[in-house]
């Protein structure tokens, strides 16, 4: 795949898009072929014809989904259209008992879910959240601190 340069009408979306693109192994380069991402419509439209790739997305999830579709769409040189079937689409991670993923693992999962066009990630926890008033709640098990949960939530909101 040729090198690409992401351009986005929403400046706050550009950095998370670049993170997700790196996660997917897309070759980013300031001198690469421009990929213009602009909000509009209800679904997703990718037009690879011309000097620049035009991406029109209806939701943030669609903007990230466009990244995972770029290699095939660029190869085929054909317009791609997709409409969402659900307003909420995501995964539930079992973070209970002895199966508590590290926050770094969840950050990676958030980026990958975004690239698939998913817009929700739920954590199923039982006693794996630290409660300062109850020091033995979840004793001897992995647990998320309130700060870790807040950071995960803030990170996910960017995607």
Predicted regions and their residues:
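Contiguous, structured surface segment used for ligand recognition
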Residues: 1-86
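Feature activates predominantly on carbohydrate-active enzymes
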Residues: 49-159
